[in-house]
Amino acid sequence: MNPIVINRLQRKLGYTFQQQELLLQALTHRSASSKHNERLEFLGDSILSFVIANELYRRFPRVDEGDMSRMRATLVRGNTLAEMAREFDLGECLRLGPGELKSGGFRRESILADTVEALIGGVFLDSDIHTIERLILEWYHSRLEEISPGDKQKDPKTRLQEYLQGRHLPLPSYLVVQVRGEAHDQEFTIHCQVSGLNEPVIGTGSSRRKAEQAAAEQALKQLELE
């Protein structure tokens, strides 16, 4: 695999593997090799659940078990992990078999989400529980700041998606139309196309995720759901 791509990924993760073979295994789908990432994924899934549960317990001392469970489910579900994978540009690093490559596996949410969990397992084996806990909390910083008990825990993208799914309408599409500024200080502009709205709605933010959330917020307002 291209070392430039691997080094770029490690910078985005905020962690450099001592055992590079663990990183390569974490990026390997079962379609590509018998030494794939599913065992690492199993481990990472449990670690992620523990770290997020522990952090929610610390942040919300008066919230009951049911609300904490719902918040944890929101934070560790597949589409959240896939969104995080796209922030890392993980798709370009995946090791996939010919069939998955041909069918666009590098874009598939389930593969992206599973790979994030495998990376968590890999970092843990390469270091220790304290290192991976710190890293997970860094990755989740903005999401943990935004989440709250009850329905308000759902971010605009999630609320918009659930609204459309409940009416059997197509999911919204998000398109980056402009990126301005230097790498350390960028502004993203997103167009969001939503069934029921004649024109795309526009969102801007300092990251693609924030711009998409801003666009979804505008869509909810136009649909009079906010």
UniProtKB/Swiss-Prot annotation:
Q: Which reaction does it catalyse?
A: Endonucleolytic cleavage to 5'-phosphomonoester
Q: Which InterPro entries match?
A: dsRBD_dom, RNase_III, RNase_III_dom, RNase_III_sf
Q: Which residues form the active site?
A: 45, 117
- Please list the residue ranges annotated as the RNase III domain: 6-128
Q: Where does Mg(2+) bind?
A: 41, 114, 117
Q: Which Pfam families match?
A: dsrm, Ribonucleas_3_3
Q: Name one GO molecular function term.
A: ribonuclease III activity
What class does this enzyme belong to in the EC scheme? Answer: hydrolase
Give the record's keywords alphabetically.
Answer: Cytoplasm, Endonuclease, Hydrolase, Magnesium, Metal-binding, mRNA processing, Nuclease, RNA-binding, rRNA processing, rRNA-binding, tRNA processing
Q: Any idea what job this protein has?
A: Digests double-stranded RNA. Involved in the processing of primary rRNA transcript to yield the immediate precursors to the large and small rRNAs (23S and 16S). Processes some mRNAs, and tRNAs when they are encoded in the rRNA operon. Processes pre-crRNA and tracrRNA of type II CRISPR loci if present in the organism.
Which family does the record claim for this protein?
Belongs to the ribonuclease III family.
Protein name (database record): Ribonuclease 3
Name the species this protein comes from: Yersinia pestis
Gene name, per UniProt, is: rnc
